[in-house]
Amino acid sequence: MELKKILATRRSVRKYLDRQVEKEVLQRVVDMALSAPSSRNTRSTRLWVVTDKSQLATISQMRDYGAAFVKDAPAAILVMGDKDKSDLWLDNCAITATILQL
């Protein structure tokens, strides 16, 4: 698929089917996201896959707004940065998060 088409047809989903995402699918997504470039190749981004309903509910309450939909999701991938590995950890997280959104 062409990049232009991927960017033009990408969409956000806030309503989910009541079924699990296969572990293999989640692992492929994580592997692809972690292949994203990083500043000075520091690889400071960490991903945490959450499928536990109680943890998803807790995560959905971590912000005042904009995260409530997470409680109904079958899985979430949290993007975190290791401050000790790079002073540009936040930039690296943003790059990885962008790949995840595609």
Regions found by a protein language model. Name each.
Residues 1-102:
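Acidic, surface-exposed loops and disordered segments
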